[in-house]
Amino acid sequence: MPIIYLSPSTQENNLYVTGGSEEEWMNRLADAMIPYLDASGIQYVRNTPDMTASSSIRASNAGNYDLHLALHSNASAPANYGRTRGIIVFYYPGSTRGRRAAEIVADNLKAIYPLPNRVRTEATTSIGEVRQPRAPSVFLELVPQ
């Protein structure tokens, strides 16, 4: 049975123009995912809001996970609030399993996002939650705040 490390954002100071924070909304998203993970037989361990990105990575690396899934939302400059759209699904270059997971996530998001041509995968080495987990990792930058 697959097991993932679910890592919603811990950025409580990254505030949304519409209210709340990235930490709050990404934790709500993780909460909403739980019944679907359970129904699909996917086990998970999850970070907590009092953790940091670094402690989330350490916790992920302390386990034996099939995937590290980080949930984030893309920041937008105040002048662009409500105008910038799209989703980026990051993975580590050279990670075949990470890339495959990113492609699966992106394909499923394209099916539900109103602008499927704005959903893409991208390799990166600059994001800690992509570069440092031992498990294949996917880092979602969802619709801008």
Can you describe what each PLM-predicted range is?
Residues 1-57, 85:
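Active-site histidine-acidic residue metal-binding/catalytic motifs
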Residues 2-18, 58-63, 68-77, 121-145:
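Active-site-adjacent mobile loop/cap segments within catalytic or ligand-binding domains
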Residues 13-25, 75-107:
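A short, glycine/acidic-enriched catalytic loop
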Residues 31-42, 62, 106-114:
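Sec-exported extracytoplasmic/periplasmic mature domains
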Residues 36-38, 81, 132:
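A generic structural signal for short, solvent-exposed coil/turn residues
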Residues 41, 86, 117, 134-136:
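A generic structural signal for alpha->beta connector loops
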Residues 46-48, 119-122:
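A structural preference for short, hydrophobic beta-strand core positions in alpha/beta folds
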Residues 85, 116, 123-126:
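Glycine-rich, flexible loop/turn motifs
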